Amino acid sequence: MTNQTVRGTKDLLFDEWYKFKYIEQTANRISSLYGFLPAQTPIFECTEVFTKTLGDSSDIITKEMYSFNDKGGKSITLRPEFTAAIVRLLIEKKLQTPIKLFSTGPAFRYERPQKGRQRQFHQINFEVFGIEDPKADIELISLAQHLLTEFGINKNVKLEINSLGDGETITKYREALILYFTKYQNDLSEDSKNRLIKNPLRILDSKDEKDKSIISDAPKISNYYTKESSDFFEQILNGLTILDIPYTVNNKLVRGLDYYCHTVFEFVTEDLGAQGAVFAGGRYDNLVSSVGGKHTPAIGFAGGIERIMELINYSPKEERPIYLIPIGREAEKHALTLANELRRNGLYVIYEYSGTLRTRMKKANQANAKAALIFGDEELSSKTLKIKNMDTGEEKIIARDNTIENIY
């Protein structure tokens, strides 16, 4: 037996846990300002939920999924991302669109653990279904920018955006890339050789040094836009300008999944090393219909909570306790009732059961208590308590019935 976490997983304790919950709760609060409704899916799904949606050229499908056969022989996968499961939810529950859904929780990918990347990680996830207008893209990017500002990290995170265009654009661009990369086929990495057959756009996403110089001279997708694609992208860029959201058009940005069309974007930073994306997403108008639903335009993005934790400065507001110090058997019995009463009035209470008065007062100091309530037989008979202000050292006698009003 080993008493260590599995590689690529982390425990969360104390301040780190509070930081985690702060991010999750902030995202939930901001999402509601934009009309998002909460949605939660299981952490595992039938494997085909992901294989049918993510594309067989994606690294997630080829290398990273945690899949297993259950006792009934059915192939099950721990979710590697949220969109596929949310699409399954949309279809299964026959949700009416347009609709905006917010979700959060753990996801799992078999990757090399490093800063900002774990095998179990947590995401905040936003999906908009049923709106084809580019204003939905603008609003979603604005929401992401709002979150970054709320977290206090917007100055060090930059927006990169691209458009993959419509189906006609992607088809023409795919053909151009096949022609271009075929000339360098022998020089490409093994992954890119496989992608050349399955989805040449994914080569543009390669981080392999062997591919980078070849990619730098590859055709630009903007040369293949249809008028509709160009107009759609132009409206989004104009909207970002109106909202004063700075951006850089990155013609090589394609994202790591096969279902994207039109808008793709990432909010990136150099503060995370190689794992620079804080938020990432895009439009996927054909995904729902490709897995058995009706045609439903959609756009979404996700962010890694652990990555945000690496970037933000957050210290939880310290909650200072009230220390109960009963002296004697009868006082100890009454302390249970008093502790119960104080806690139900929203106060943080530590009931110190044993030790000398001096020892217990020392512990109250160590716990940074704001007040100590001290009582024995004398106080019980007079229905009073002695309260000590731990900051000033001031002591006074108060009526037992007025305890709440006299807490410092």
Curated annotation (Swiss-Prot):
Which EC numbers does the record give? 6.1.1.21
Annotated HAMAP family: His_tRNA_synth (MF_00127)
From the broadest rank down, the organism's phylogenetic lineage runs: Bacteria, Pseudomonadati, Pseudomonadota, Alphaproteobacteria, Rickettsiales
The UniProt subunit note reads as follows: Homodimer.
Q: Could you tell me which species this protein originates from?
A: Wolbachia pipientis wMel
Reactions mediated catalytically: tRNA(His) + L-histidine + ATP = L-histidyl-tRNA(His) + AMP + diphosphate + H(+)
Give GO BP annotations, semicolon-separated. histidyl-tRNA aminoacylation
Q: Which gene encodes it?
A: hisS
By what name is this protein known? Histidine--tRNA ligase
Q: Which EC class is this protein assigned?
A: ligase
Entry keyword set:
Aminoacyl-tRNA synthetase, ATP-binding, Cytoplasm, Ligase, Nucleotide-binding, Protein biosynthesis
Give the matching Gene3D superfamilies: Anticodon-binding domain (3.40.50.800), Bira Bifunctional Protein, Domain 2 (3.30.930.10)
Q: Which GO terms describe its cellular component?
A: cytoplasm
